[in-house]
């Protein structure tokens, strides 16, 4: 059963009983266009879930319903995902893994979000508690919400019952912001692109590739040279793929094996590549503060328009590779 079907009824009952203004923040706004994906969908409360991205964690659960997915570097040069849900919140999401320091700045531009994760380094927990988010980590919730999938092997078996978590948020009258403008501009087209078939993104111990599908009008992903297929059987792939070039530096935190946690710097400015509709747009990104959104612009200052639909943002400090094609075969 999906959140989209259950949640409004829960809200009606809760509001009738409590009349609490905090709960009203969980009501999807009346906007006809979702700020995060540009489609004709409501702007619901924002849930961010940390998801394991190792080979053992695949196939992942629920990512096909995310509005935005961030790929971030973690210890050992591996990647981990931060999935942002608003328009639709699926029943199950996972496998859930622990939070990292890069998450704080990534999620702050969304306002006060519901933040779901498996745990964190003890030294880092006070930072999460002090951040402008609702800390809903597994250490605070029961096993009925952070479940164990019997068909998976720990630590790749924790699966979030997102529907139950959102009901608990309503029952507790917690304040969660609905989706808002975070800098994305959506349009049917964007001029000045280079026809492109494929992009390859690099991290020290992981790779992603994206191949343009003319029939599906999206970039079909592969993870470590294997098709990125969700548990549902859906081939994961966004309509807009952003490669955001960032500085990645060692942080003061370490994992339980002593590996230094990298910090991806997402406040500031830098180079960006945006892929949509089978074309590549080279430009820049800019973000002035933790609370402000991230904008993407062409060299002349015009915004780079995203295509309506799911957005993936790869945070990396390594230049990607692109395979272009003759312009008369584009789109």
Regions found by a protein language model. Name each.
Residues 21-24:
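Bacterial signal peptide processing site
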Residues 1-7:
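Bacterial N-terminal signal peptides that target proteins for export
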Residues 17-19:
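C-terminal motif of bacterial Sec signal peptides marking the signal peptidase cleavage site
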Residues 26-44, 48-68, 75-331:
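A surface/extracellular/periplasmic glyco- and lipid-processing/surface-interacting theme
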């Amino acid at each position: 059963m999906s959140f989209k079907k259950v949640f409004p009824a829960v809200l009606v009952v809760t509001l009738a009983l409590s009349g609490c203004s905090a709960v009203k923040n969980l009501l999807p706004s009346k906007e006809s266009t979702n700020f995060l994906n540009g489609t004709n969908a409501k702007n619901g409360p924002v849930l961010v879930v940390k998801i394991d991205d190792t080979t053992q964690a695949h196939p992942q659960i629920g990512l096909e319903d995310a509005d935005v997915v961030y790929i971030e570097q973690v210890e050992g040069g591996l990647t981990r995902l931060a999935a942002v849900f608003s328009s639709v919140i699926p029943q199950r999401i996972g496998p859930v893994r622990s939070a990292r320091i890069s998450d704080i700045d990534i999620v702050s531009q969304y306002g006060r979000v519901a933040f779901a994760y498996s745990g964190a380094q003890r030294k880092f927990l006070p930072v999460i508690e002090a951040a402008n988010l609702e800390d809903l980590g597994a250490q605070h919730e029961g096993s009925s919400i952070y479940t164990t999938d019997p068909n998976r092997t720990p630590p790749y078996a924790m699966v979030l019952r997102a529907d139950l978590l959102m009901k608990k948020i309503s029952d507790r009258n917690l304040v969660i912001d609905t989706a808002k403008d975070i800098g994305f501009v959506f349009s049917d087209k964007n001029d000045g692109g280079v026809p492109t078939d494929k992009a390859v993104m690099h991290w020290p111990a992981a790779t992603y590739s994206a191949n343009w599908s003319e029939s599906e009008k999206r970039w079909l992903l592969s993870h470590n040279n294997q098709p990125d297929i969700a548990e549902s059987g859906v081939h994961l792939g966004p309509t807009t793929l952003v490669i955001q070039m960032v500085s990645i530096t060692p942080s003061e935190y370490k994992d339980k094996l002593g590996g230094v946690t990298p910090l991806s710097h997402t406040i500031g400015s830098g180079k960006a590549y945006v892929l949509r509709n089978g074309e590549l747009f080279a430009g820049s990104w800019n973000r002035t503060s933790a609370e402000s959104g991230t904008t993407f612009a062409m060299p002349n200052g015009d915004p780079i328009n995203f295509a309506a639909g799911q957005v993936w943002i790869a945070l990396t400090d390594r230049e990607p590779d692109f395979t272009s094609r003759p312009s008369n075969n584009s789109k």
